[in-house]
Amino acid sequence: MNSKLIRFLAVLIAFASCGFAFAQESDSNKNEKLILTVDDAVNYALKNNQSLKSAAIDLEIKKRANSYSWNTFLPSASLSGTLARSNDIDTIKSSIESSAAFPAFLQGAAVRNDLKDGLDAVGYVDASKIIDDMYGSEEAALWHPVGNLSFSWAFNAAMLKSISATKKQYEAGLISWEQSVRETEVNIKKMFYGILLAQENLKIQKESMRNAEARWHQAEINYRNGTVPRLSVLNSQVTYENMKPTILSAENSLKQTKETFGFLLGLPYGTKIDLTGTIETSYVDVNADELFKKYVEQNNEIKSLKKNIELIKTGIDATYLSTFTPSLAVSFGLQPTVSNITKNWFDKDNYSEGGNLTITLAYSNLFDMLPCSSNMQKLKDSKQQLAQAEIGLEQLYQNAEIEVHKLCDNLTVSRANIEAMRNNVTLAQEAYDSTLKAYNNGTQELLAVRDSESSLNQARLGLMNENYNYISAVLDLETKLNITLK
């Protein structure tokens, strides 16, 4: 009994150890941070973003439709089998009695003595006895298996335009997919750098809070040395305490932004993210006129609208062809019918072959050619939609030119601002260091330190914001022209 108890306890301890190890591993995985560069973030988004996955399905649907667009030329075919029963035996008897082939049948049958019971003394037919000899019973004579195999095929010149339209729809889908990918990349990059900016802002605020704490403690030292009044200590402490709620709010906002960023990357909720990188940027030389002339045709909006114009034109051509050209229809059918259900169904003497072949060339509706018909009115609507699309294309070119010049101007101004702000940060840092040193020596008021630190923080944040603006302008320009600037 003791040995069993010992074994049971050993097993229980082993399970507990495994569970503890698993719990430790789960906690470890949960606490692990995913370290991402901007390129890593983009790759995660392209692989896992739900919107892109949905767009990929749309593209796959259009790709498959384009690959098999030729199936519009396939004929339709049907195969059926019917077991038909007649409700009128008298009709069958009359058919037997009046059959032109029946005398020959009787002659052969009389020779064989197969149907001698079906003839009376003067040679008239007894149809009931003949049916019994042929089918075995009147019920069997009522049943007839019938097969049916039919093919039909139709063609109109508009079908060729339909195939062309399917191809253009797939090409439009490719443009839309490329646009979705580009927009995802840009949004992820902007959000990535936006988070870096928020992190730097939080870092500056925490540094300011540490400085405020240091000034508070320095004020206490100065108070004990008798160089400053008690009010200076209290003011320093209040300044320090007032910073805590602001920093807590900034930390919470940054946490929520990272969670949203993780969702856009397709990461599980709760995944901790650590972004690595800087908001510093390398400059690019741009010439608005050259960029517009060279790359405007690569603009995804322009390419998409051009493809839409092609689709409208294809639809107009298809309407013309379906209206003013005839349609060809070919139909072929076979209908074998078994004569005697009790005999071999595949015996060529036991079934009759029915069927037909028809070839038709026709206009579906002549009234569709009339100018007042709904068909022609729809055609006019399509032409006006085409005119609107062409006007929209001209506007896109104009807007693209304006945007390219605007973004290039923004880059030039932003670049100049960055250079000026870098110098300003250097000066603000020197001013703050001097003011802080004087405050620690008791020759400057706390207000002067606050003003100096505020100026330094504004200069640093301004520089980071301007760097972010420059990066955003580069990304917008790359998106507008669908290129990568180097």
Describe the function of each predicted region.
Residues 2-5, 36, 175-298, 410, ...:
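Periplasmic alpha-helical coiled-coil/stalk elements that build and connect Gram-negative outer-membrane
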Residues 4, 24-31, 85-91, 96-104, ...:
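Acidic, low-complexity, intrinsically disordered peripheral segments
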Residues 9-18:
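Bacterial N-terminal signal peptides
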Residues 23-90, 95, 167, 269-310, ...:
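Bacterial Sec-pathway N-terminal export signals of envelope proteins
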Residues 29-33, 80-155, 276-283, 317, ...:
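Small/polar, glycine/serine/threonine/aspartate-rich low-complexity segments that form flexible
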Residues 53-57, 70, 139, 154-181, ...:
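Sec/SRP-type N-terminal targeting helices
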Residues 223-227, 439-443, 480:
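A short glycine-centered flexible hinge/capping loop motif at secondary-structure junctions
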